[in-house]
Amino acid sequence: MSIVYILAAILIFGVLIAVHELGHFLAAKACGVRVNEFAIGMGPAIWKKQKGDTLYAWRAFPVGGFCAMEGEEDDSNDPASLNNQGFWCKLLIFAAGALMNFLAGFLIVFFLYIGAKGFYTADIAKLNPDFPQQGESGVMVGDRIYAINGERVYLHSDVGLILQAIPLDENGTIEMILLRDGEKLERTLTLQDYTDENGKSYRAYGFTYGGMEEANFLTRLKYTCLNTVDFVRTVRLSIQMLLNGQAGMKDLSGPVGIVTTITNVGEQSENTRDAIDNIAYLAALIAVNLGVMNLLPLPALDGGKIFFLVVNGISRKVFGKQIPPKFENYVHYAGLVLLLGLMVVITFQDVWKIFT
């Protein structure tokens, strides 16, 4: 592995986690919550400065950071403590880290698209001569693939992603929605047997797809938005594949696995410019991934805190009481232990893959 790409991967992790914590910090300040310390990096402090109520620190290891708020882990009578804030302030503070990750992913993609000349589309480009559903009542060249089995096609690459992620029967039956002159058309397609020019048989749907939309400011903005939404959907499909058994533990990657992926992407790029662009695009995906994963309603994650916040809000209105803070803390601590245990297992698995 190239040391340059390894360092780049570590830097990406550090920056994205720091951006996440910056979101919590800015939201806390906006809501009047006292932040006792805001640190970039982990480990011993190599620089620190007290400004007002907050200690700002730069720590030795560039692998994230933290935002320590008053009343975050225990009850505090201080009006500026987190536990004394209202529902909406708490919701904003808990969600702000993930929102900053989404914003980071969006901005990275937008800057990558500034130099784009055009964007590939999922338009039907060619039909096999033996394709059984040609014509107005079937599929025509120029039709745009809008959705497959209920999954919206935002980008050219989505067609392959969706076909890989969704369960299919033995005939590969798909329900496809096409756009033709602004009208949505429903079509059912199955895999067919075809013969190539060398006489070799193969199974396929019988069409190729790909067009080009010219780039301008509005299309760049549109495809940046679509790409960001698509990143979120990619994470959802990955979770869905884990739950339905299409993927397993062996397909999960932790920091070591992602460092390996970033290194491979860099080394397989044709030149330095392509390496920078490809790694930046992967960083955007990781940023959005961090945002989505942190919003999952699991203990110790921001989503778990939001879950308890909502449950407590409902409980106060219906029963006049809330879940004891100590119990919630125990749940988050237990969740943290389980998540750290899972991370250890995945890390060992990632290291094993490197040497096998």
PLM segments and residue spans:
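PDZ-domain C-terminal substructure recognizer with occasional recognition of PDZ-binding tails
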Residues: 162-201
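Functional transmembrane alpha-helices
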Residues: 81, 85, 126-130, 193-290, ...
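Residue-level signature of transmembrane alpha-helical entry/exit and packing/kink sites
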Residues: 1, 5, 9, 85-94, ...
